[in-house]
Amino acid sequence: MERQNIRIRLKAFDHRALDMSAKEIVNTAKRTGAEVRGPVPLPTRIERFTVNRSPHIDKKSREQFEIRTHTRILDIVDPTPQTVDALMKLDLSSGVGIEIKLEGAR
């Protein structure tokens, strides 16, 4: 029988909230007896925007903004039913996006 993996991908603008959420998921999974790989930090995606400061003239006067998106990946290897139930009941902080995929073992 093929083993199952749960791959969890976390995204957030604030890296502290992201790390706290990842730590909470790892603690929950380990408490229920599952093996956890990660969190693995992926490269930070930086989007930069340059806008004119004034609405009319002064092309040379500009302002720059950036958005940093931090990403982490966790793999839960061969989860138990208790692990899945505990992860479903887990309440993560706001501002952290979570994407869960169920896949076969590699």
UniProtKB/Swiss-Prot annotation:
InterPro entries, sorted: Ribosomal_uS10, Ribosomal_uS10_CS, Ribosomal_uS10_dom, Ribosomal_uS10_dom_sf
Protein's UniProt keywords contain Ribosomal protein: yes
Pfam families: Ribosomal_S10
An example molecular function term from Gene Ontology annotations: tRNA binding
Keyword Ribosomal protein appears in the UniProt entry: yes
Key words of the record: Ribonucleoprotein, Ribosomal protein
GO cellular component, one term: ribonucleoprotein complex
Highest rank taxon of the organism: Bacteria
GO biological-process terms attached to the record: translation
Gene3D superfamilies (alphabetical): Ribosomal protein S10 domain
Subunit structure: Part of the 30S ribosomal subunit.
The protein's role, per its UniProt record: Involved in the binding of tRNA to the ribosomes.
Protein family membership: Belongs to the universal ribosomal protein uS10 family.
This protein's name: Small ribosomal subunit protein uS10
Organism: Hyphomonas neptunium (strain ATCC 15444)
Upper classification of the organism: Bacteria, Pseudomonadati, Pseudomonadota, Alphaproteobacteria, Hyphomonadales
Gene this chain is encoded by: rpsJ
